[in-house]
């Protein structure tokens, strides 16, 4: 044995939960001046603005940086009241064992403060669990320094380093003096003075005498006695039959014992290769040498034969998100010049390129300029989080410039999410490209213009955030005006493009503003983009947005006041009508307001007698507005519910509807509008309808409901033909779409039908295969719908199936676009995506069945319809749901 030895633990053997100790938070925030409190009293609700050591909560969570998925749920440290400083000194036990952690796992520590009745984030801090240098689990105390707007960084504090060395055992322990010295060291740390609005959080990892080194746990099904060439012997005393019937005998024998090869008729054995999933170093070296020459003229003239062309076509036709093997990447790279005229091949070339390698990156970026122009769906794919090279993203933005405003509106929600990837801190590779920097301070005249526009834009932001967005508050008020004016506004290429298009098209500008506003709760740096957009608007357009913000603030105040009233629905309705007549109506009488849900509609009054309060714990409001052209626009306004998931689903339905119409297939879909105007508030377009449950209770069937409104004795079913046509088409469209999106929790109370026969779904709280009920059907097709068709032998049922097949076929052809849009939403805070980003995209991809031919896909969908028609369990669950609703009432 060597004279020197190193002792350590391996993480795969540490089956204990991870613990983190929250010690203290140092630092002070600038307090509000008396004048600021008078100007905006709402700012005083944020406790840290008025109290130096305001109460705070701390939550700790483990997440995986590679998959962007959460490993654990957030765990809160016990509440501790503060007096002279923010000191917790509390251990938090996380529900994950050390052996399950990887170097990609990080801690997400969120400091929470109070804003009136709400809990809002003060700062989100991330820190690795393992050291980057040697992959050892962190030990001892760690200090994390941060500002409200800056990126947190681990601070080296000599006092804490000394304490850690004591914990590690580097100093000899003497009990009589250790306690005194430690107290003095802690006091010295407390004396550290930090600048105003600068903070330092100290946490402690468990102190273990020996370091814990990360090791990957081998697979559980690994063969224990691994066969090698040195221990095979055909003349072994063991027979193949004996080794097969008694595995224990084989795996527990002396290692020197020969393992039988078997007889000549059965000589095939399975080997375990521990390196089977690792990169082959020889192939890796070959790849580097092959691609090292920048001017490899031979590749420019290489052309594939017929067999190779088919192979390349197969690779190019892979759906977005599919990983390429090393051989597939090599083939794409070899024939890259041949593929330059194939617009679909560019994304596969980028997948096959190591953009971190300067030689490869330079060559590919040069080739992109001469590549065949890619489609918009491929351009969207290049804006995902996987592509961090700004030259690639700028190339995609240049392609988007050729898209029409109507197309951009369809993708705007995802494009705003893509802007979130372009935070300066997230890019490690900025070569061959740069950000567009909009610096208004370049001249005194520009500076003067900016000051005027900035003050107006901040008025809009202030009026909107007073009840909604506490993260805006600090970004506007935490620094002196002189400090703010010195900062340039840094805008990424995509954000700059969207701002310019939003300035030209007022409809795009309306949705851009509200999408950015709702996302800024999770991405504070979006405030900078929002401010840049507002500062460039002319005074009339800024005034329009300000009026919208004010109207929604009035509605929010009405909703919160009604929610606080603990009384009957009729009393709440009376209060609503009083509030609308005294607050909302006078506001609309003085000015015309463009509807945020649809800026083409202008509101001039509210129809108080047609407004109501829904029976729900959130007390959503039913508001009917009178429009400038003499029409009415009913909508539902909710506070306390995150509508961003519903907004996403309805946007995808609208997109699919447009894709179908582009193929001259109109399935009479009703993609009503949903707009999330904040983290937990928003508006929903209200379409007059009845739920299937109400129709069955009142009319005892769908056909009697149609006959009551559109009778026709000359028709076979006694209903006007256009009503049945609407019903059959819309049922087919929504069956296909809800199947593809994995919409769950379907019951007769969220299946809706209009008097004109249009069928549609509501309430998208469960998507992508999520469902609160056991054994949910892949497609919801109640027997009452089949009965309304005229039965399974009717012509309407055959039409329904044909429409389903056509819609499924068209949407499969556009699967790349839909999957790329979901890829852009992968890092969003949509609940059913956030729980498993990779898995959620995979579920959508699986339902497209892209590996099937057109005929096989049609047969697959026919089987789905047959299973749904004959399913009994959904009928039982519907009855149980109705029974539960009855007892709740």
UniProtKB/Swiss-Prot annotation:
Residue limits of the C2 PI3K-type domain?
34-184
Which SUPFAM superfamilies does the UniProt record give? ARM repeat, C2 domain (Calcium/lipid-binding domain, CaLB), Protein kinase-like (PK-like)
> EC top class, in one word?
transferase
Q: List each copy of the PIK helical domain by range.
A: 298-540
The annotated topology with respect to the bilayer is:
Peripheral membrane protein
Q: Which GO terms describe its biological process?
A: ascospore-type prospore membrane formation; autophagosome assembly; cellular response to potassium ion starvation; endocytosis; intracellular iron ion homeostasis; iron ion transmembrane transport; pexophagy; phosphatidylinositol-mediated signaling
Please give the catalytic activity noted in the UniProt record.
a 1,2-diacyl-sn-glycero-3-phospho-(1D-myo-inositol) + ATP = a 1,2-diacyl-sn-glycero-3-phospho-(1D-myo-inositol-3-phosphate) + ADP + H(+)
The UniProt entry, under InterPro entries, shows: ARM-type_fold, C2_domain_sf, Kinase-like_dom_sf, PI3/4_kinase_cat_dom, PI3/4_kinase_cat_sf, PI3/4_kinase_CS, PI3K-type_C2_dom, PI3K_accessory_dom
Pfam families to which the protein is assigned, alphabetical? PI3_PI4_kinase, PI3K_C2, PI3Ka
Instruction: Consult the record and explain the modifications the protein receives after translation.
Output: Autophosphorylated.
Region (Activation loop), start-end ranges = 761-782
Matching entries from SMART domains are given as: PI3K_C2, PI3Ka, PI3Kc
Q: Which cellular compartments is it found in?
A: Golgi apparatus, trans-Golgi network membrane; Endosome membrane
Region annotation (Catalytic loop) ranges: 742-750
The EC code for this enzyme is: 2.7.1.137
Renumbered residue ranges of the record's region G-loop: 613-619
Keywords, A to Z, come to: ATP-binding, Autophagy, Endosome, Golgi apparatus, Kinase, Membrane, Nucleotide-binding, Transferase
Effect of a null allele:
Leads to large vacuoles and defective respiratory growth. Blocks maturation of the phagosomes and renders cells hyperadherent to epithelial cells and susceptible to the antimicrobial arsenal of primary murine and cultured human macrophages, as well as to thermal, salt, oxidative, genotoxic, cell wall and cell membrane stresses. Displays defects in protein trafficking.
Family the entry assigns? Belongs to the PI3/PI4-kinase family. Type III PI4K subfamily.
Q: What is known about its subunit structure?
A: Component of the autophagy-specific VPS34 PI3-kinase complex I composed of VPS15, VPS30, VPS34, ATG14 and ATG38; and of the VPS34 PI3-kinase complex II composed of VPS15, VPS30, VPS34 and VPS38.
Q: What biological function has been recorded for the protein in this entry?
A: Multifunctional phosphatidylinositol 3-kinase that plays a role in signaling in modulation of host immune response, intracellular survival and virulence. Catalytic subunit of the autophagy-specific VPS34 PI3-kinase complex I essential to recruit the ATG8-phosphatidylinositol conjugate and the ATG12-ATG5 conjugate to the pre-autophagosomal structure. Also involved in endosome-to-Golgi retrograde transport as part of the VPS34 PI3-kinase complex II.
Its name, as the record gives it, is Phosphatidylinositol 3-kinase VPS34
- The gene from which this protein is expressed is VPS34
């Amino acid at each position: 044995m060597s004279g020197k030895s190193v002792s350590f633990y391996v993480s795969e053997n540490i089956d204990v939960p991870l613990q983190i100790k929250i010690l203290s938070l140092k630092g002070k925030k600038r307090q509000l001046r008396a004048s600021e409190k008078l100007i905006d009293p709402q700012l005083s609700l944020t406790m840290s603005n008025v109290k130096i050591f305001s109460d705070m909560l701390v939550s700790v969570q483990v997440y995986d940086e590679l998959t962007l998925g959460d490993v654990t749920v957030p765990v809160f440290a016990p509440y501790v009241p503060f007096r002279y400083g923010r000191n917790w000194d509390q251990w938090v036990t996380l529900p994950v064992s050390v052996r399950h952690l990887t170097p990609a796992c990080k801690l997400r520590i969120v400091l929470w403060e109070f804003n009136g009745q709400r809990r809002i984030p003060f700062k989100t801090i991330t820190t690795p669990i393992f050291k980057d240098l040697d992959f050892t689990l962190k030990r001892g105390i760690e200090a994390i320094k941060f500002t409200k707007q800056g990126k947190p960084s681990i601070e080296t504090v000599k006092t804490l380093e000394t304490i850690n060395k004591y914990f590690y055992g580097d100093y000899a322990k003497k009990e009589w003096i250790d306690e005194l010295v430690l107290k003095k060291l802690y006091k010295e740390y407390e004396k550290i003075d930090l600048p105003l609005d600068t903070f330092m959080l100290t946490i402690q990892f468990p102190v273990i005498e020996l370091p814990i080194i990360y090791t990957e746990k081998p697979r559980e099904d690994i063969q224990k006695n691994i066969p090698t060439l040195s221990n095979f012997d055909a003349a072994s005393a063991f027979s193949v039959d004996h080794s097969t019937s008694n595995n224990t005998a084989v795996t527990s024998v002396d290692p020197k014992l020969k393992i039988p090869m078997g007889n000549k008729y059965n000589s095939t054995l399975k080997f375990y290769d521990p390196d089977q999933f690792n990169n082959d170093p020889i192939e890796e070296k070959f790849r580097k040498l092959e691609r090292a020459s920048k001017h490899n003229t031979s590749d420019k003239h290489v052309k594939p034969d017929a067999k190779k062309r088919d192979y390349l076509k197969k690779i190019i036709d892979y759906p977005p998100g599919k990983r390429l093997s090393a051989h597939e990447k090599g083939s794409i790279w070899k024939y890259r010049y041949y593929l330059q005229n194939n617009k679909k091949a560019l994304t596969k070339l980028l997948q096959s390129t190591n953009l971190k390698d300067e030689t490869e990156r330079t060559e590919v970026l040069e080739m992109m300029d001469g590549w065949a122009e890619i489609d918009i769906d491929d351009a969207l794919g290049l804006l995902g989080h996987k592509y961090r090279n700004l030259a690639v993203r700028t190339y995609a933005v240049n392609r988007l410039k050729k898209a029409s405003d109507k197309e951009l509106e369809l993708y705007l929600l995802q494009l705003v999410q893509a802007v979130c990837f372009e935070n300066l801190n997230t890019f490690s590779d900025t070569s061959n490209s740069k950000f567009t920097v909009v610096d208004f301070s370049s001249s005194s005249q520009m500076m003067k213009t900016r000051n005027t526009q900035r003050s107006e834009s901040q008025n809009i932001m202030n009026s909107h955030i007073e009840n909604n967005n506490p993260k805006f508050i600090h970004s506007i008020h935490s620094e002196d005006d002189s400090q703010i004016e010195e900062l340039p506004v840094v805008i990424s290429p995509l954000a700059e493009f969207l701002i310019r298009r939003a300035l030209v098209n007022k409809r795009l500008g309306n949705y851009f503003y509200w999408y950015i506003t709702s996302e800024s709760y999770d991405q504070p740096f979006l405030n900078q983009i929002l401010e840049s957009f507002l500062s460039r608007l002319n005074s009339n357009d800024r005034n329009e947005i300000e009026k919208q913000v004010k109207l929604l603030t009035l509605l929010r105040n009405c909703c919160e006041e009604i929610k606080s009233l603990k009384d009957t629905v009729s009393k709440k309705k009376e209060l609503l009508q009083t509030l609308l007549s005294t607050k909302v109506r006078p506001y609309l009488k003085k000015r015309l307001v463009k509807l945020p849900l649809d800026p083409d509609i202008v509101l001039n009054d509210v129809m108080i007698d047609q407004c109501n309060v829904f029976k729900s714990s959130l007390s959503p409001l039913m508001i009917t507005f009178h429009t400038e052209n003499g029409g009415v626009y009913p909508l539902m306004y909710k506070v306390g519910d995150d509508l961003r998931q519903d907004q996403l689903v309805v946007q995808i339905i609208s997109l699919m509807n447009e894709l179908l119409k582009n193929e001259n297939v109109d399935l009479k879909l009703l993609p009503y509008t949903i707009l999330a105007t904040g983290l937990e508030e928003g508006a929903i377009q209200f379409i007059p309808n009845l739920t299937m449950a109400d129709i069955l209770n009142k009319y005892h069937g769908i056909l009697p409901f149609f006959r009551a409104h559109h009778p026709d004795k000359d028709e076979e079913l006694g209903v006007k033909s256009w009503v049945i046509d609407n019903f059959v088409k819309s049922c087919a469209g929504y069956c296909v779409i809800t199947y593809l999106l994995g919409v769950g929790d379907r019951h007769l109370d969220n299946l809706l039908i209009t008097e004109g026969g249009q069928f549609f779904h509501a309430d998208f709280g469960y998507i992508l295969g999520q469902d609160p009920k056991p054994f949910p059907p892949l497609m919801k097709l109640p027997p009452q719908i089949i009965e309304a068709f005229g039965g399974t032998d009717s012509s309407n049922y055959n039409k329904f199936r044909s429409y389903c097949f056509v819609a499924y076929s068209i949407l499969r052809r556009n699967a790349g676009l839909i999957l790329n849009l979901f890829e852009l939403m992968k890092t969003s805070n949509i609940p059913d995506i956030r729980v498993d980003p990779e898995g959620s995209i995979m579920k959508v991809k699986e339902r497209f069945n892209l590996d099937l031919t057109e005929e096989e896909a049609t047969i697959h969908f026919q089987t789905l319809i047959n299973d749904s028609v004959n399913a009994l369990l959904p009928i039982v669950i519907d009855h149980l749901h109705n029974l539960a609703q009855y007892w709740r009432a």
